[in-house]
Amino acid sequence: MQDGLADAQWYRPAVSPERMQVLMARSNGRAAFHTVLWLALLAGSGALAFQSRGRWWAIPAFAAYGALYGGAADPRWHECGHGTAFKSRWANDVVYTVASFMLLREPTMWRWSHVRHHSDTIIVGRDPEISFPRPFKVRVVLANYLHLLNGPAMLRRMVRHAFGSIDDDARDFVPEDDLPRVVWEARIFVAVLAGVIAWSVLIGSIVPLLFIGLPSFYGVWLLWFFAVTQHGGLREDVLDHRLNTRTVYINPVFRFLYLNMNYHLEHHLFPSVPYHHLPQLHAEIKHHLPPPKTSMFAAYREIVLALRRQHKDPTWELPLPVLPADAPAAVLSSKVTRDVEDPEADAVDIGAADMIETGRIVRLDLNGRTYALCRPTADLYALTDGLCTHGQTHLAEGFLDGCTIECPKHNGRFDVRTGEPLRKPVRIPLATYEIERVGGRLMARLDGRRVPPPPALRTTPSR
């Protein structure tokens, strides 16, 4: 791996903070509707498959069931893993866990794997989710459409984890204190699968396995049908998602099955934007991006060309797309920069109380240090360190939902009042500072001590 590629800063186009707050808003209703519709189709196709067993139309019925089980589960797993599909955390976690089982993915291990994928997208030696490692091998890709290589490998790994043997690859990206969770999740998944196998043996029929377990294999073709378009044939070891990720226009049925992940470039640029807002995000930033592929056929034509060439010459690359000549990076947050006379004073005047609107975040740079100033409600202000403790990304570019701030890079969350980590991958608390409104000004303790404004001027404190 080249120096400077791990956990680096990536290109992102400029979008106004006001617009980003709208685009990053989540909805329980829309995600619930799409999830219920998916499960209804899964149940309906499963009932049809069960009723038609032994007849020729069982083949298309089971094909549909498998595609919804082992294929359409993937984007649900993905979006709920980011915590953006539903507004409610518990709903995201439930769907994520169920989809993980359907895909034979151990939840905690794969959550951390995907964090690494977003930190180091298609960086060789760092990204554990590179689908087409070079030199490209045709037989490997064809076998993956039926899970003939990856599936057995994932099951073997799951069994090893169930016995407490964690492989070095998993240890590379899963924190030590999460390894026991990996073991217990593997044990639960193995126990369920073993129970289904025992059920099939007991009744002398493969039917139970056709509904639980085997769909992860015979239905995975749909997963790969969509997934190869994300990064297939594009560049390795670059710090611009426009060079290693593609967007593809597809029809409404495919968009439902794939949960708008065809806007994959937009997703990598702004992973905090939920799937149902990706079309709007695309419209907002498309003038910064390469032209999208106009169909799955166009995408596959490019992918096949690239993979054929890379099979013979691993260094071969597709021609560089024409990119707009804008800045390599852009500040996305409202920003206030100023110097204060004595940052160690009992109370530091950091600015006017009305410099930040309710529900917004402002980047505040004072004397060479950077902070995130938040206003969850009209009477509540909070001041934290500006950089996320996990990815060193500025939190002012993130999403404020009540008293929770979300990192724009990995979707980790903190309570802005206490700095407490609320969602992984963040594990280290965020430094917070006492702040109160005194008249029309904001007074802060930048040394961590409490502000003592005159009682007559005191309003609701931030903590």
Language-model-detected regions and their locations in the chain:
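Short cysteine/histidine-rich metal-coordination sites, predominantly Zn2+-binding motifs
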Residues: 402-408, 421-430
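Transmembrane alpha-helical segments that serve as helix-helix packing and pore/cofactor-lining elements
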Residues: 25, 79-86
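Histidine-centered catalytic micro-motifs
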Residues: 73-82, 110-122, 226-233, 257-273, ...
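Non-catalytic, topology-defining segments of multipass membrane proteins
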Residues: 1-67, 76, 101-209, 275-346, ...
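Juxtamembrane helix-capping/reentrant segments at transmembrane boundaries
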Residues: 85-104, 126-139, 239-251
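Membrane-embedded alpha-helical segments that form the functional core of polytopic membrane enzymes
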Residues: 52-75, 98-108, 216-220, 249-260, ...
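Transmembrane alpha-helical segments that form the membrane-embedded catalytic/substrate-channel core
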Residues: 67-77, 106-110, 154-158, 211-239, ...
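N-terminal pre-ligand scaffold of iron-sulfur
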Residues: 332-402, 416, 429-463
